[in-house]
């Protein structure tokens, strides 16, 4: 089904609005994928907050014109699925992870921070841990010195408490022997 001019303008406007909110673009060729596989990919993308859309390349080029993703226009050829995300790595991660399990989805490239990325660049971007994991690791780094200090102080207190307890036991024993002798 072909789109008339108004429909095309609406598609370009919708994609351009998504592009304006996104940090990352991932491109993949979907030739040979079954409908079930595409549905699975779309479901995964939705769960991760990734806008995934099959577009005519001409419309995609118009949507990214004048944006940070314009540099990826050279990679826009063939039957492509476009993944946009506000999260810096989500789109790349969804596409790369799906391509690992399905060889018919072929990575083509993408863009991040105004720079075009090749296949290796998209894979490298996807290998970065998620924001939540990075925050957890950072929190662990912040907590590590504090917990280490607390353990040292507890060990020091225990070390000082043991001789004090032994002295108290000896003093009690001395008092008991004096009372028994006296």
From Swiss-Prot:
**Signal sequence, renumbered to the chain:** none
What cellular component GO annotations does this protein have? ribonucleoprotein complex; ribosome
GO MF terms, alphabetically ordered: large ribosomal subunit rRNA binding
Please name the InterPro entries in this protein's record. Answer: Ribosomal_uL10, Ribosomal_uL10-like_sf, Ribosomal_uL10_bac, Ribosomal_uL10_bac_type
**Coiled-coil segments:** none
Pfam families given for it?
Answer: Ribosomal_L10 (PF00466)
Q: Which UniProt keywords apply?
A: Ribonucleoprotein, Ribosomal protein, RNA-binding, rRNA-binding
Q: Name one GO biological process term.
A: translation
Function, as annotated: Forms part of the ribosomal stalk, playing a central role in the interaction of the ribosome with GTP-bound translation factors.
Q: Which HAMAP family match?
A: Ribosomal_uL10
Q: How does it assemble?
A: Part of the ribosomal stalk of the 50S ribosomal subunit. The N-terminus interacts with L11 and the large rRNA to form the base of the stalk. The C-terminus forms an elongated spine to which L12 dimers bind in a sequential fashion forming a multimeric L10(L12)X complex.
Give the NCBIfam families listed for this entry. PRK00099.1-1 (NF000955)
What is the similarity comment for this entry? Belongs to the universal ribosomal protein uL10 family.
Protein name as it appears in the record: Large ribosomal subunit protein uL10
Q: Which gene encodes it?
A: rplJ
């Amino acid at each position: 089904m072909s789109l008339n001019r108004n429909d095309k303008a609406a598609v370009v406007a919708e994609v351009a609005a998504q592009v304006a909110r996104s940090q990352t673009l991932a491109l993949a060729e979907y030739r040979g994928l079954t409908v079930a596989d595409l549905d699975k990919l779309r479901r995964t993308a939705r769960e991760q907050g990734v806008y995934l859309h099959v577009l005519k390349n001409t419309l995609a080029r118009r949507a990214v014109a004048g944006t940070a993703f314009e540099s990826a226009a050279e990679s826009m050829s063939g039957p492509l699925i476009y993944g946009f995300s506000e999260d810096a790595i989500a789109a790349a991660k969804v596409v790369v992870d799906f391509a690992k399990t399905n060889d018919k989805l072929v990575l083509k490239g993408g863009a991040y921070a105004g720079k075009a990325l090749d296949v290796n660049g998209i894979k490298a971007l996807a290998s970065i841990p998620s924001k939540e994991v990075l925050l957890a690791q950072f929190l662990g780094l912040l907590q590590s010195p504090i917990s280490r200090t607390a353990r040292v102080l507890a060990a020091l207190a225990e070390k000082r408490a043991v001789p004090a307890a032994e002295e108290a036991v000896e003093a009690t024993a001395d008092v008991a022997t004096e009372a028994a002798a006296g």
